[in-house]
Curated annotation (Swiss-Prot):
Domain F-box: residue ranges: 43-90
InterPro entries, sorted: F-box/kelch-repeat_ARATH, Kelch-typ_b-propeller, Kelch_1
Identification of the protein by name: Putative F-box/kelch-repeat protein At2g29780
A Pfam family per the record: Kelch_FKB95
Organism: Arabidopsis thaliana (Mouse-ear cress)
UniProt entry tagged with the keyword Electron transport: no
Length: 398
């Protein structure tokens, strides 16, 4: 509850208030009667109900929440409450929020940045560093559920992977450690299926614990036996990247594409894996069960290709906006699903500074023909002296 104070505004300064001439002729009994009526009124509440605070805060744009949480304990309690997320959802006020993990090797480890997308006062779109979050371990896997990001494994030194897992609350930019995994992992696959986090690889394969599952409700890790012959071809057991389509985990290995169905514990590769890998590169994301990936070589005439798992075919994304891209290094770009729009992050190098660009694209799908990409915005959002490495970008909703 937030405490408010009452103040006196009777116009007196310690003495008897001056009366107007007409007040001198009033009947004192009338004044007594009015005082009795006032005394019978319910007292003014000295506390604002949490429900009222919550509904008021729900109307405020989420970009102000981290600053608002610093004002008082009452605001921190409301902003970090699950009820606020439920209130915003019921009012259809939830917003996608985009985070990027960017480092400047060898000068700094990757740090989290937030994209200020709907900021007020005509401040341009920009990436802002989040000082309250610690640097991330290289090679961590990151998944999102609602307004939370789960950071899994990574390296804390040369050849020293860790079992640690922590969760970031994006509403107030705080993090808390969770129970550790059974295995230490580096560049593992981590994806969410039916509200559970599946972690695959990132370590040498052992049949009994190469796959682990985290139940976010109970906070318990469990292992999934896997006696298949599928494994990573990379040293240390890591993978290039992964996505989820049709409740299956699609994995890009250095030599092939793999598909894991966690419901029945089966794997697919073969012809599917060959077709899947033909235009799949690390910069990728899934929007409405379609896989979007950069093709640095533009082999199909477009820098972005789209994979449909229903027909197992890659098609180039078209649109005049794609030809307007700045001179990005496509190998180092990153993609994200931003509320159904395609977000692209990439850098251009203009000595002595480097600009990191954000390109927001609306997707137009017809009954037939290729998907069209229309640019909504294309602006530099971060300028730096050192060359950035964009490790990943993720969107959350709150």
């Amino acid at each position: 509850m937030a405490i408010i104070s009452e103040t006196s505004d009777d116009g007196s300064h310690g003495g008897v208030p001056n009366k107007k001439p007409e007040e001198l002729h009033k009947n004192p009994k009338e004044d007594d009667h009015q005082e009795e009526e006032v005394e019978n009124h319910p007292p003014i509440p000295r506390q604002i109900p949490q429900a009222l605070i919550r509904r008021t805060v729900a109307l405020i744009k989420r970009c102000h929440y981290p600053s608002l949480s610093l004002l008082s304990k009452a605001f921190r309690i409301v902003i970090s409450s699950p009820e606020l997320h439920q209130t915003r959802s019921s009012l259809n006020l939830t917003e996608p929020v985009l985070y990027a993990l960017i480092g400047f090797p060898p000068h700094s480890f990757p740090n989290w940045f937030i994209l200020n997308h709907n900021i007020t006062r005509n401040i341009p779109l920009r990436l802002s560093a989040i000082g309250s979050l610690p640097p991330m371990n290289p090679g961590s896997a990151v998944v999102t559920i609602g307004y939370k990001m789960y950071v899994i494994g990574g390296l804390i030194g040369p050849n020293n992977p860790v079992k640690t897992v922590f969760v970031i609350d994006c509403r107030v930019h705080t993090c808390n450690y969770l129970p550790t995994m059974h295995r230490a992992r580096y560049r593992a696959v981590a994806e969410v299926i039916n509200g559970k986090i599946y972690v695959i690889g990132g370590c040498e394969k052992r049949y009994d614990d190469w796959i682990e599952v985290f139940d976010v409700v109970t906070g318990i890790w469990s292992t999934v036996p896997d006696r298949s012959h599928f494994m990573s071809s990379l040293p240390g057991g890591g993978f290039v990247t992964s996505v989820v389509m049709q409740n299956k985990i699609y994995i890009l290995d250095a030599t092939c594409g793999l598909v894991y169905d966690p419901i029945d514990g089966t794997w697919e590769s073969g012809e599917l894996g060959t077709t899947l890998k033909s235009y799949w590169y690390k910069p990728c994301c899934v929007i409405e069960d379609l896989l979007y990936s950069f093709d640095p070589y533009c082999l199909q005439g477009s820098p972005i290709n789209v994979y449909d798992p229903n027909v197992m075919v890659w098609t180039p994304m078209m649109g005049t906006g794609i030809r307007a891209f700045p001179d990005l290094d496509y190998f180092e770009c990153k993609m994200a699903n931003f509320g159904g729009k395609l977000m692209v992050f990439g850098a251009t190098y203009n000595n002595p500074v480097t600009d990191t660009w954000c390109i927001e694209m609306a997707l137009i799908k017809g009954e037939t023909g290729p998907i069209l990409g229309m640019i909504d915005s294309m602006v530099p959002v971060l300028r730096s002296v050192y060359s950035p490495y964009i490790d990943l970008c993720r969107s959350v909703t709150f």
